[in-house]
């Protein structure tokens, strides 16, 4: 039986959904600033990738608010923007962080392979779940590389915060995808998501504070023209 989005969400629940979106968006901005501090050439691409992630989250939150309001207004394009924006945005952030880890800008094209394949698969099946898988993989990758960067700086608390983010990224989507959930369960899931995204933001802030400003000239990615 198809789920009617107009009866799925309460207005207060839909409004609260903006909080984890804003926390995640702030986290991606801070990560972009941290990456740019260590490797100036990746600053703008990382910030643009973070903006793409935030755009997708805001589009989904606005959609949820519109279907929860009276009268219900359902614009599926807003809902369907989420996973494409997450997949490509997270891929861009991952590329920037790999460059920071290596000390030189990474080639961007390998990081586009999975999002492009996910987009093609989504078009083929008429659903965005392939891009959901790509977004989850990229988000976990960001968490892992962020843990390594935090540990390299001796920041164990930062590593714990990013670990919480990874666990939440893996556990919450399957739970949230179950149909016909009670409002209490949805509040629990959304509150947990807020804490997960807060952990991501706090970990990113700690990473930014411990990232020194780059003073050395950057090494170009392998294969780049000189």
Regions found by a protein language model. Name each.
Residues 1-54, 61-81, 88-226:
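Polytopic alpha-helical membrane-helix bundles and their juxtamembrane interface segments
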């Amino acid at each position: 039986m198809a789920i009617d989005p107009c009866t799925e969400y309460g207005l207060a629940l839909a409004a609260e959904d903006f909080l984890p979106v804003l926390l995640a968006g702030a986290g991606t901005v801070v990560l972009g600033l941290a990456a740019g501090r260590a490797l100036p050439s990746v600053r703008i691409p990382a910030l643009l990738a973070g903006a793409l992630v935030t755009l997708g989250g805001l589009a989904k939150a606005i959609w949820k608010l519109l279907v929860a309001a009276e009268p219900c207004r359902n614009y599926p394009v807003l809902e369907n923007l989420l996973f494409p924006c997450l997949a490509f945005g997270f891929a861009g952030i991952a590329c920037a962080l790999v460059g920071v880890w290596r000390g030189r800008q990474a080639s961007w094209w390998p990081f586009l392979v999975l999002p492009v394949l996910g987009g093609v698969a989504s078009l083929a099946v008429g659903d965005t779940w392939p891009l959901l898988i790509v977004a989850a993989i990229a988000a976990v990758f960001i968490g892992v590389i962020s843990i390594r960067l935090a540990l390299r700086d001796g920041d164990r608390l930062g590593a714990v915060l990013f670990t919480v983010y990874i666990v939440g990224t893996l556990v919450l989507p399957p739970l949230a995808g179950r149909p016909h959930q009670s409002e209490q369960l949805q509040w629990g899931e959304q509150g947990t998501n807020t804490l997960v995204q807060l952990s991501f933001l706090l970990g990113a802030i700690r990473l930014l504070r411990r990232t020194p400003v780059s003073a050395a000239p950057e090494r170009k990615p392998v294969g780049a023209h000189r």
